[in-house]
Amino acid sequence: MKAVGIVVEYNPFHNGHAYHLTQAKKVAKADIVIAVMSGTFLQRGEPAMVDKWTRTKMALAGGVDIVIELPYVYSTAPATDFAKGAISILTAVGCDSFAFGSEDGSIQPFLNTYDLIDNNRTEYDALIKDSLKTGASYPKSLYYAYEQLTQKFPAPYIDLAQPNNILGFHYLEAARTLDSNIKPLTIPRIAAGYHDALKQDSSIASATGIRKALASTSSLQSVQKVVPETSFDYLTDWHRHYKKFASWESFWPLLQFTIMRHTPSELTRYAEVTEGIENAIMKAAKNSSSFNSFMEKIKSKRYTWTRIQRMITHIYTGFTKEQLQSFEAPSFIRLLGMSAKGQAYLGKRKKDIELPLISRVAAANDAMLAIDIHAAELYNLSIEQGVTAQSLPKDYQTPPIRN
């Protein structure tokens, strides 16, 4: 059986995602689709709007055959490590290819871009350092260095100002760095851009647009036409039970408490928290009544919103720099769900899979997995605050979902 891999967050699963996985399967001429999906906390440093199990159900209903969790260590990391973790897992599970969405759907500009940077690495790194010295943020410095090289060596390259192109580049980079035989493929994105708001006449919207619409109206009807019926039903069921979708705003009381129980110097223990920002974080926490006002007090030219959110995520979950440095690569494959075809694939390929395949978490003993379970427990704690409805599934007790 031929498998194509995709890297996803499904926050939530929408019509654009359904198109992407259908096209990925078609272009790859694959029998099954394997998705590596972030768990409870995501790459932009924020909690998923619904838990990993609900999103797994959405994925299986939408046509994914196997859903594997991207460990917290990678799901909350900068793009380079996020991609490395995901591509490592897709390679280990035996995918022949991986597919990602991009602005124009052509793989050659991605290959050109990788070669440009790889062949001029010394100059590229020097340009980044020069830009950082001016006080520019790291993402802006990367883009500056890239622009300088593209002007010096003209060719068809990708636009690295586009979020999906950035991730696509890092997926390709990870595959090359890992010396993986997995083949890169790209699918053109349709209609909605990453940050676009919902449009009344369109059935396609970005996940960001959907979350913003729900945050501003609290009406599920506003997003009904841009998500599959099954996703809409799962979102409706979630909201009926928990009265909210997860966000840092809804987590704010517990997040504020977590920050304030530390001293400023203690905050620097946590992953990505750079010395110099700890006092600003503490001062903002003490003087803010909401997450948004907290963030507005900290963000600056040097620290992007996303970078600060990742720091905050690690403070909230207690994930330290020491822990981060102790991991070099994914150490297991956590199975979240599978279709009948997915189960058949695993049955045939199980002996060839390069990492331990975990379906019964309670029987496993792995330091990286323990971090995932702890993050899920803290996520559940915030969701269940003030709610008398049924409890969320206990992460270490929940078996893979079968569809």
Curated annotation (Swiss-Prot):
User: Which keywords label this protein?
Assistant: ATP-binding, Cytoplasm, Ligase, Nucleotide-binding, RNA-binding, tRNA processing, tRNA-binding
One Pfam entry for this protein is: HIGH_NTase1
Alphabetical GO CC annotations of the entry are: cytoplasm
| Signal peptide interval | none
Give the record's family classification: Belongs to the TmcAL family.
Q: What is its EC number?
A: 6.3.4.-
- Catalytic activity field: cytidine(34) in elongator tRNA(Met) + acetate + ATP = N(4)-acetylcytidine(34) in elongator tRNA(Met) + AMP + diphosphate
Q: Where does ATP bind?
A: 7-20, 101, 164, 189-190
Q: Which NCBIfam families match?
A: PRK13670.1
Q: Where in the cell is it found?
A: Cytoplasm
Q: Name one GO biological process term.
A: tRNA modification
What is the official name of this protein in its record?
tRNA(Met) cytidine acetate ligase
Kindly list the GO molecular function terms attached to this UniProt entry: ATP binding; ligase activity, forming carbon-nitrogen bonds; tRNA binding
User: What exactly does this protein do?
Assistant: Catalyzes the formation of N(4)-acetylcytidine (ac(4)C) at the wobble position of elongator tRNA(Met), using acetate and ATP as substrates. First activates an acetate ion to form acetyladenylate (Ac-AMP) and then transfers the acetyl group to tRNA to form ac(4)C34.
| Organism expressing this protein natively | Lysinibacillus sphaericus (strain C3-41)
Is Cytoplasm set as a keyword in this record? yes
